[in-house]
């Protein structure tokens, strides 16, 4: 059947396809969040380790991800993210506070597939800036938080209705809070227990596709919790291995839009990423000298988000 009141250009299912782009873009922003709050925080802490209080220490983290998103239909996403930060530590009575302004960039491509075979694809990229902070207490307890904002640009194309395409730009905001405790098991082994809350919001946009129909995209919001633990084993003074498990729950992640033609308007079917994801991670860190540190990691996910990701971390001291 056709979308009620929207004319015969769009079948009910087909109207969902252009909205899947919002799901891909929101996931890219979340992957940027994940990079910052894992490898980014580790890098910031390592960058200031052994350095003078107040000195500025640059670090870079990068990740590449291949994800399959269950949105009711599904989206395949390939994304690359990067953070560049400048870490500084401030000693206090409880331990030390690490703060770092960060610049972030991400780009990727996606393919969306509806159950009826409709296929759409496109590209996305974003850039933004933010601030991260982490209080590390001497007893192993820590608290952390971050704020980010920037612009996301996406495009879409599909053979729906004889061929449609569009470009879209929107502002995004993101924040997170976390706390955890690092427990020293012995002189070589630690376990880090943590809980984190993530919030990401991408503003809406109104676009016109080639058929003359308009899509009025609502703002999309992601609200996630993540509970996990990571075990780290110090192989030597300069080498460490880690392995971790985490459970993530997405409370929202729905993308809504109103489709309008000369015959009227109707809501497009809404893709949603609400649900649970399990995450496993493995990694290795090496400190070759006082001036340079390297980290490599891999992660896999199952559930609402399925896929694999890789990250690379570099620290430089001057």
Per-region residue spans from a language model:
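Extracellular, surface-exposed repeat/solenoid domains
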Residues: 1-4
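Outer membrane beta-barrel translocator domains of Type V secretion systems
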Residues: 7-191, 299-309
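Solvent-exposed, glycine/polar-rich loop segments of beta-barrel outer-membrane systems
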Residues: 72-74, 113-122, 153-169, 201-221, ...
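Outer membrane beta-barrel transmembrane domains
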Residues: 130, 185, 215-318
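Outer-membrane beta-barrel porins/channels
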Residues: 178, 192-196, 210
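Solvent-exposed flexible segments
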Residues: 181, 196-202
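Short, structured loop/turn "capping" segments at alpha-beta junctions
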Residues: 186-192, 202-206, 237-240
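Alpha-helical membrane segments in multi-pass integral membrane proteins
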Residues: 190-198, 223, 243-245
């Amino acid at each position: 059947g056709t979308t009620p009141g929207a004319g015969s250009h769009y079948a009910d299912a087909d109207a969902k396809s252009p909205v899947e782009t919002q799901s891909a873009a929101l996931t890219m922003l979340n992957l940027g969040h994940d990079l910052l709050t894992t490898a980014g925080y580790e890098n910031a802490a390592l960058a200031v380790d052994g350095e003078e209080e107040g000195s500025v220490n640059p670090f870079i983290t990068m990740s590449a991800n291949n994800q399959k998103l269950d949105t009711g239909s599904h989206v395949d996403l390939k994304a690359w993210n990067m953070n560049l930060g400048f870490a500084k530590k401030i000693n206090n009575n409880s331990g030390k506070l690490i703060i770092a302004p960060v610049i972030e960039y991400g780009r990727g491509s996606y393919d969306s597939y509806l159950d009826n075979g409709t296929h759409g694809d496109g590209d996305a990229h974003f850039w933004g800036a933010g601030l991260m902070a982490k209080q590390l207490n001497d007893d192993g307890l820590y608290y952390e938080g971050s704020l980010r904002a920037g612009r996301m640009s996406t495009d879409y194309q599909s053979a729906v209705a004889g061929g449609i395409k569009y470009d879209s730009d929107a502002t995004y905001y993101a924040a997170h809070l976390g706390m955890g405790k690092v427990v020293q098991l012995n002189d070589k082994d630690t376990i880090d227990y943590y809980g984190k809350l993530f919030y990401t919001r991408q503003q809406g946009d109104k676009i016109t596709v080639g058929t003359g129909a308009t899509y009025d995209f609502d703002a999309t919001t992601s609200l996630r919790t993540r509970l996990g633990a990571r075990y780290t084993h110090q192989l030597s003074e300069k080498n460490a291995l880690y392995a971790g498990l985490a459970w993530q729950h997405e409370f929202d992640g729905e993308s809504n839009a109103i489709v309008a033609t000369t015959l009227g308007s109707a809501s497009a079917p809404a893709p949603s990423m609400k649900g649970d994801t399990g995450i496993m991670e493995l990694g290795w860190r090496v400190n070759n000298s006082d001036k340079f540190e390297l980290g490599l990691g891999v992660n896999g996910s199952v559930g609402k988000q399925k896929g694999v990701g890789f990250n690379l971390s570099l620290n430089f001291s001057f």
